[in-house]
Design a protein with these regions (language model features):
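Gram-negative/organellar outer-membrane beta-barrel architecture
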Residues: 1-115, 119-124, 193-194, 198-205, ...
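Extended beta-strand-rich architecture
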Residues: 5-9, 25, 54, 101-263, ...
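Conserved active-site loop/cleft motifs that coordinate metal ions or position small ligands
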Residues: 233-236, 270-275
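Outer-membrane beta-barrel domain signature
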Residues: 33, 40, 66-73, 77-79, ...
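Outer-membrane beta-barrel proteins
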Residues: 33-42, 130-140, 278
Length: 295
């Protein structure tokens, strides 16, 4: 859960009043993880500047530079030093990490109607790199790719299917020097519903200390039916996890199921879901709320 967060963002046109803009962001976040996995706190300061260029071809490009510094604090009353993964076992209860990443991203959405689509697809790709010594604790590269598709069919277009897939890979000179919040985690509204945000991923030893992963694979499949004008009932399943490709840590693929209501409102699609995780113990039914197109 996020306990405290503050962020300031400013945007202004650059070389075109509508299709080219600069955006700057600075912020602070305090996050406490206490989800039957570990008691852990992360204090993060971050800043970024990005140039967003919208092209007539539909491909939107983003050039970015972002910095984040994480201070990690472990509850010393819950863990002994010997029970913690490196580097926490060398730095007692506090550890500071940082990274400066230069990035490039492209994305494209094709649909019959951007506000109220009945068919379409989106695709997105990004790459961020950082160099050790240049305000980064290690050499690293983060690659992401994802896509979403929607198709409506049947009499009066009452039936609809939606699929989503998101993949990621993190290369680093030393994974333990990658800032904690820059690693891959899964769970939450836009990941695997039925689980808390970022509560899934590789864990360390018998203490189940959540360390994050260097790979990500998350997917979703949904079927919905229009039972009255502008209203649809949906059933769905989400699946995947953040993974450790070295084999040092174990974690299973997480699966959840759920149902929900979709309302095509004047301001866009409103989605209300309830979901429950099927993998792991003590999974409560969770409520998820969204406004906007699923593409």
């Amino acid at each position: 859960k996020v306990d405290q967060a503050v962020e300031f963002t400013a945007s202004l046109p650059y070389k075109h009043p509508l299709n080219d803009k600069l955006t700057g962001t600075v912020g602070y976040q305090h996050k406490e993880v206490d989800d039957l996995v570990n008691t852990f706190e992360a204090d993060t300061v971050y800043a970024s500047i990005a140039r967003n260029i919208y092209h007539d071809s539909g491909w939107n490009r983003t050039y970015s530079l972002r910095y984040r510094g994480d201070k990690l604090t472990v509850d010393p009353e819950k863990y002994s030093t010997d029970s913690l993964p490196y580097p926490f076992n060398n730095y007692a209860s506090d550890y500071t990490q940082q990274a400066l990443l230069a990035g490039y991203a492209i994305n494209k959405t094709v649909a019959d109607n951007m506000l109220t689509p009945t068919w379409g697809y989106s695709q997105r790709y990004s790459l961020e790199v950082g160099a050790k010594g240049a305000l980064s604790d290690t050499n690293m590269a983060i690659l992401r790719a994802g896509g979403t598709g929607m198709y409506t069919f049947g009499k009066d277009n009452k039936q609809q299917v939606i699929g989503r897939l998101d993949l990621g890979y993190l290369y680093s000179g030393d994974f333990y020097d990658v800032p904690y919040r820059s690693r891959f985690f899964a769970g939450g509204d836009s990941s695997i519903r039925g689980y808390n945000t970022d509560s899934l991923g590789p864990t360390y030893g018998g203490e189940n200390f959540l360390v994050g992963g260097d790979a990500l694979a998350v997917g979703s499949a949904e079927y919905n039916y229009e039972f009255r004008p502008s209203f649809r009932g949906a059933v769905f399943t989400d699946f995947g996890n953040a993974y450790d490709t070295t084999g040092e840590y174990d974690n299973a693929t997480a699966v959840s199921i759920g149902t929900g209501i979709r309302w095509q409102s004047p301001i866009g699609l409103v989605r209300l879901d309830v979901a429950k995780g099927l993998t792991g113990d003590n999974n409560d039914v969770r409520l998820h709320f969204f406004i906007g197109s699923p593409l």
